Amino acid sequence: YRDKRVKVSFELPDECDVPIEKGALLELLGNLLENAYRLCLSEVRISLVESQEGIELCIEDDGPGVPPDQRARILQRGERLDRQHPGQGIGLAVVKDIIESYGARLTLGDSPLGGAAFKIHFPAL
């Protein structure tokens, strides 16, 4: 899958202070982007929105998505949605642990692109 062409689009403000350490941010972005890239058909979108309620970071793709009845399960250590793709089922559990350690929350839904949308909600400070 590393040779496929993927359009990556960004919807980001010029500046935004995300309340998370650099290493933790890189770890969770790496896991989410790796999954999005691996499972997308041709497009991944990264967006960040700041509001009075806090900051929302969203990674979404145009892949197969995640069925609603599987969303909680795939965030557990050792669980994978699809055994046909490589992986150990650890990445999303690590992402969830990192996010929760910062008082943020992770939601998983449908993307307007047609695939999955992983949203990280950091509360306002």
Feature map (PLM): residue ranges:
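Conserved polar catalytic motif of the HATPase_c/GHKL fold
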Residues: 30-31, 35
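Short alpha-helical Gxxx[C/S/T] motif in the catalytic ATP-binding
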Residues: 91, 95
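Short beta-strand/loop element within the Bergerat-fold HATPase_c
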Residues: 43-53
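Acidic ATP/Mg2+-coordinating residue in the GHKL
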Residues: 61
